[in-house]
């Protein structure tokens, strides 16, 4: 019976896998939309991710060469980051169990009974998805792999559409449902030209901008006609990104742009003179407009400039406070906590026991992947993940000039590192979809190189005409 089922399903394996991954990629941007997440008693993203996991596991189960595939895949550098997260997380769970006998706190017991199981469940789901994705990756065609990126762009496109709609609503009163987002400008004392920030369907700009920048990079890769990319995709995305007035988003674009420029400068295939000339021609009029209308530009950017006064004040800026003080709290209680952490999701314990200078409670995250993992998994776990993350970046960077897909892969990984500094979403669909698309780019680059080698070998083996040179 099982053998018959395998024979029946095997021809459809790639289609089923592609369907599951396309669903995950399309729905990933909505995981930061509260209305979407609260549609069911259990978070919607958890339900959809679990459904995707079940479908991928079913596809893998009917695979005929599971053991040999597993052995080969475990040697892949793609698993560095996964292993560096999975093993320390397991040790952190053991450490959290030990802490129950050491940290005599009802808040810690509450965390252990509630937040820990949820975090472990989410982590297991996403690590399992990416593991199965890598195991089954070679069964997907290039077209099916591209569908995953296009599906992710489709989800981001919905956020862009609602962002433009929100701009019309907040600027001219065009009717729109009240989404209860943090679109108001805050922490600014001076007058502003525009007193709102675009959030689209998300709760605040910092939730939105990582998806927009994802879309800019992936869209550039997938759009064959770059003029269509400019008018149909890039300009609408940049419009929403600009009016988000997100400091982290602006900094993210700048850093990724500088890194992409560095790749271009060190590239062996791009003519720098042809690139620099149009860039300078476009920057000169922009600079002149800024100089001529400086007061207007100053008011326009006041939602950003006006927040610099408290941006680096550790005691009054909640996000900075939650970034700095975990390095101190990590050494509380015992050396077990210092080395192995307080347990997955233990920032919830901090949220119940620590307070800001003005009396408010902490958030359940530092909004930084690396700081969260340092506190939750300790010096060993946090350090292992950081090292693996950097090693995989180096692995991609060394191959950047071999194929254009490798360039997109290293840019995406660099961008993921930047967004991880201000969005702690490593147990959410977006983080793992970007990991997936990065691996996808590397696989397409590998296939492209192999196709070129095969073409060269085929030409060298062609028989020459008698008397030919």
Enumerate the predicted regions with their spans:
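Loop-to-helix entry and N-terminal half of a specific, functionally important transmembrane alpha helix
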Residues: 16-29, 232-235, 364, 368, ...
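N-terminal hydrophobic segments of proteins, predominantly signal-anchor/transmembrane helices
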Residues: 18-36, 52-128, 416-417
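Transmembrane alpha-helices of multi-pass inner-membrane enzymes
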Residues: 19, 25, 29, 53-57, ...
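A conserved mid-to-late transmembrane alpha helix and its immediate loop/hinge
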Residues: 204, 246, 357-396
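Flexible juxtamembrane loops connecting transmembrane helices in multi-pass membrane enzymes
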Residues: 274-275, 290-325
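Long extracytoplasmic/lumenal interhelical loops at the membrane interface
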Residues: 310-377
């Amino acid at each position: 019976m099982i053998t018959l089922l395998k024979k029946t399903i095997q021809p459809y394996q790639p289609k089923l896998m592609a369907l599951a991954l396309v669903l995950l990629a399309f729905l990933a941007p909505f995981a930061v939309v509260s209305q979407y997440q609260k549609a069911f008693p259990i978070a919607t993203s958890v339900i959809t991710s679990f459904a995707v996991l079940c479908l991928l596991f079913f596809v893998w189960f009917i695979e005929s060469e599971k053991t040999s595939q597993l052995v080969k895949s475990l040697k892949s550098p793609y698993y560095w980051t996964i292993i560096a997260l999975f093993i320390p997380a397991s040790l952190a769970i053991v450490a959290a169990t030990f802490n129950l006998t050491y940290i005599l706190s009802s808040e810690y017991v509450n965390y252990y009974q509630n937040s820990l199981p949820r975090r472990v469940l989410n982590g297991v789901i996403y690590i399992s998805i990416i593991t199965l994705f890598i195991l089954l990756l070679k069964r997907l065609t290039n077209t099916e792999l591209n569908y995953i990126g296009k599906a992710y762009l489709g989800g981001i496109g919905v956020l862009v559409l609602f962002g433009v709609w929100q701009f019309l609503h907040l600027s001219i009163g065009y009717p729109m449902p009240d989404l209860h987002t943090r679109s108001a400008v805050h922490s600014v004392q001076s007058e502003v030209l525009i007193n709102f920030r675009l959030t689209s369907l998300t709760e605040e700009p910092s939730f939105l901008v990582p998806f927009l920048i994802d879309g800019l990079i992936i869209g550039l890769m997938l759009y064959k006609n770059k003029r269509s990319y400019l008018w149909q995709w890039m300009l609408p995305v940049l419009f929403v990104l600009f009016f988000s007035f997100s400091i982290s988003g602006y900094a993210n674009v700048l850093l990724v742009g500088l890194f992409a420029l560095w790749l271009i400068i060190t590239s062996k295939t791009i003519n720098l003179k042809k690139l620099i000339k149009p860039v300078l021609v476009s920057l000169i009029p922009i600079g002149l407009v800024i100089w001529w209308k400086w007061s207007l530009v100053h008011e326009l950017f006041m939602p950003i400039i006006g927040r610099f006064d408290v941006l680096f004040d550790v005691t009054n800026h909640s996000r900075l406070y939650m970034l700095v003080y975990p390095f101190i709290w990590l050494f509380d209680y015992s050396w077990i906590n210092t080395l192995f952490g307080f347990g997955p999701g233990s920032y919830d314990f901090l949220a119940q026991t620590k307070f800001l200078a003005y009396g408010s409670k902490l958030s359940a995250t530092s909004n930084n992947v690396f700081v969260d993992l340092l506190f939750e998994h300790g010096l060993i776990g946090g350090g292992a993940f950081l090292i693996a993350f950097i090693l995989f970046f180096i692995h991609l960077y060394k191959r950047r000039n071999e194929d254009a897909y490798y360039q997109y892969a290293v840019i995406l990984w660099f961008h993921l590192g930047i967004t991880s500094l201000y969005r702690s979403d490593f147990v959410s669909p977006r983080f793992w979809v970007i990991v997936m698309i990065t691996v996808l780019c590397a696989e397409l680059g590998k296939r492209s190189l192999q196709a070129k080698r095969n073409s060269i070998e085929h030409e060298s083996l062609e028989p020459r005409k008698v008397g030919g040179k």
